[in-house]
């Protein structure tokens, strides 16, 4: 059963404690359903840790989307409807990134997702002296192959949860803000047909995180 974190400061203290006990780089893997607020939470944790002198970097898995051209060749012209599902990511490369983030002592370039071009771009960099990695993404704790290899490279695992009704509205607004839909109602429909389906899969097919933060 997962422990419960009551505040971001509790997560910061937990990361500090782990870092004090681990030689070399620390890697913490964070999962959660789309719209739960993972990125916001881990960025707050990273800012606090960097302020304490622990060089911390947030790395997201969104850059490991298959490019749209490749995705269309894989599943057809309506691939955009399914983008964000587990099979629309290059899982093998995500696993390899998890290994590098934990084990490499060199600078590590990595892809991020450009919302301007709606495709991955190689513009991220983890510097070799980074002490702690916060690797966040929807599917990082799936118990499906090959995703289930990721936890072998994690010093700790965290989950972020949020009320499902809030998640649905946040996702709809996100789709509207990014130009994927033209009305909030269309955003809700897209959330229902894709993001919330993926969220249900995450809940049902992920290993429990060591500690869970309930977002508000």
List the model feature ranges, each with a label.
Residues 117-175:
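ATP-dependent NMP and nucleoside kinases share a basic, alpha-helical "lid"
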Residues 38:
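Conserved lysine of the Walker
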Residues 32:
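The Walker A (P-loop) glycine that initiates the GxxxxGKT/S ATP-binding motif of P-loop NTPases
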Residues 35:
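Walker A (P-loop) phosphate-binding loop of P-loop NTPases
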Residues 57, 66-114:
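Conserved nucleotide-sensing/catalytic segment adjacent to the nucleotide-binding pocket
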Residues 41:
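Hydrophobic positions on the alpha1 helix immediately C-terminal to the Walker A/P-loop
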Residues 1-29:
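Extreme N-terminal, non-catalytic leader segments
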Residues 123, 145-148, 176-216:
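Small-molecule kinase domains that catalyze NTP-dependent phosphoryl transfer to phosphate-bearing small molecules
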């Amino acid at each position: 059963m997962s422990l419960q974190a009551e505040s971001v400061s509790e997560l910061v203290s937990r990361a500090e404690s782990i870092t004090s006990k681990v030689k070399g780089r620390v890697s913490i893997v964070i999962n959660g359903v789309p719209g739960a607020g993972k990125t916001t939470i881990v960025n707050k944790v990273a800012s606090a840790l960097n302020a304490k002198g622990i060089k911390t970097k947030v790395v997201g898995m969104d850059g490991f989307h298959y490019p749209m051209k490749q995705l269309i060749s894989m599943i057809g012209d309506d691939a955009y409807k399914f983008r964000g599902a587990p099979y629309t990511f290059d899982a093998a490369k995500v696993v390899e990134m998890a290994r590098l983030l934990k084990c490499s002592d060199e600078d590590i370039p990595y892809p991020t997702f450009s919302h301007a071009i709606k495709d991955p771009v190689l513009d991220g960099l983890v510097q070799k002296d980074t002490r702690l990695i916060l690797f966040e993404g929807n599917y990082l704790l799936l118990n499906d192959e090959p995703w289930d290899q990721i936890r072998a490279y994690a010093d700790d695992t965290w989950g972020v949860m949020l009320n499902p009704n809030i998640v649905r509205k946040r996702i709809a607004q996100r789709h509207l803000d990014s130009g994927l839909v033209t009305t909030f109602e269309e955003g809700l429909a897209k959330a229902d047909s894709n993001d919330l389906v993926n969220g249900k899969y995450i809940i049902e097919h992920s290993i429990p995180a060591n500690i869970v933060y309930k977002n508000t």
